[in-house]
Amino acid sequence: MTGLDRERIVDGAPALSAEELQAALAGLPGWQLAGDGKSICREWRFKNFKQAAQLANLAAWQAEAAGHHPDIAFGWGHARVSYSTHSAGGVSRNDLIMAARLDAATG
């Protein structure tokens, strides 16, 4: 999904179909559909707490800038970020954009 990280967040974006979502996730390595089928998530492993906190803070800063906020969990050596568009009742293109932005920022 080249360029997905440069797309605009759009208010009122609808939930994606299962087919659209699976195709999009193929272009976002490491991201997967959560068990509830209504969010995407990715987990990272780190060598210490500081690196996990840095990723959580990066995701938070990006979310504030875009006005689209994930669920973030982290602890010693791990972090998990989950995106969902609650108003759409599932995963929208906005969630994919934010996942791509986080990937682009983390290399």
Swiss-Prot record:
Disulfide bonds: none annotated. It is an enzyme of class 4 (lyase). It catalyses: (4aS,6R)-4a-hydroxy-L-erythro-5,6,7,8-tetrahydrobiopterin = (6R)-L-erythro-6,7-dihydrobiopterin + H2O. Its EC number is 4.2.1.96. It comes from the Bacteria. Pfam families: Pterin_4a. Belongs to the pterin-4-alpha-carbinolamine dehydratase family. This is Putative pterin-4-alpha-carbinolamine dehydratase. It comes from Paracoccus denitrificans (strain Pd 1222). The lineage of its organism: Bacteria, Pseudomonadati, Pseudomonadota, Alphaproteobacteria, Rhodobacterales.
